[in-house]
């Protein structure tokens, strides 16, 4: 028999499994029963950790956004300017293709912004990412806007299954996205 898991470790496990379920089914379509089953706990226990489905969705969404923030910090790795944006863009693009649930959870979070609590948290998380990219790159707002716009376009292309470069029609688009990640001013 395995040792008992601490509540903190169990919360992390629940959030990880919730991301998988919410990424696939969205806020409305996902059930706490499915999440509890994936974790191997009862629904009453799940609700002791997260009193409502919304609380669990918010925790999963925040974890997903924090992973994006960490990715940007790690990718920049002391670089500044366009070099930082290029490194962050490359890391982001790679994660989009290697961690589909991460992408889908982002999209499900945006789709759930009809809910004021989700919308508020999403704004705060996006602001934190925006501020960090500004701090890491030191670039003008126009460069950062293009960087974020390209990232959102990459989200759509990845969701449609075309970020992998396997479709010749999309090759020029992908090359343009990868070239000079956020350059307005050279």
Language-model-derived ranges and their functions:
Residues 59, 66, 70-100:
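Hydrophobic alpha-helical connector segments
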Residues 17, 21-24, 71-75, 105, ...:
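Solvent-exposed, amphipathic alpha-helical segments
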Residues 1-9, 13, 51, 55, ...:
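Residues at secondary-structure transition points
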Residues 101-107, 126-180:
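Hydrophobic alpha-helical segments that form the core
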Residues 1-7, 172-186:
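N-terminal intrinsically disordered/low-complexity leader segments
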Residues 90-97, 105-115:
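Helix-loop "lid/cap" segments that line or gate small-molecule binding pockets
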Residues 13, 17-55, 59:
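Helix-turn-helix
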Residues 66-70, 96-98, 115-142:
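Amphipathic alpha-helical packing segments from all-alpha helical-bundle domains
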């Amino acid at each position: 028999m395995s040792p008992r898991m601490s509540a903190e470790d169990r919360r992390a496990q629940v959030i990880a499994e919730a991301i998988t379920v919410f990424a696939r089914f969205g806020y409305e379509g996902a059930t706490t029963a499915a999440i509890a089953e994936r974790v191997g706990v009862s629904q009453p226990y799940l609700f002791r950790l997260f009193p409502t489905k919304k609380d669990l969705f918010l925790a999963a969404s925040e974890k997903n956004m924090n992973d994006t923030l960490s990715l940007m910090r790690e990718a920049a790795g002391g670089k500044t300017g366009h070099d930082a944006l290029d490194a962050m863009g490359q890391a982001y693009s790679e994660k989009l293709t290697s961690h589909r649930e991460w992408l889908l959870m982002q999209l499900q979070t945006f789709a759930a912004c009809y809910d004021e609590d989700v919308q508020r948290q999403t704004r705060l998380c996006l602001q934190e990412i925006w501020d960090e990219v500004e701090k890491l790159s030191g670039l003008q707002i126009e460069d950062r806007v293009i960087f974020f716009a390209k990232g959102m376009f990459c989200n759509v292309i990845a969701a449609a299954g075309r970020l992998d470069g396997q479709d010749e029609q999309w090759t020029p688009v992908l090359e343009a996205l990868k070239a000079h990640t956020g350059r307005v001013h050279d």
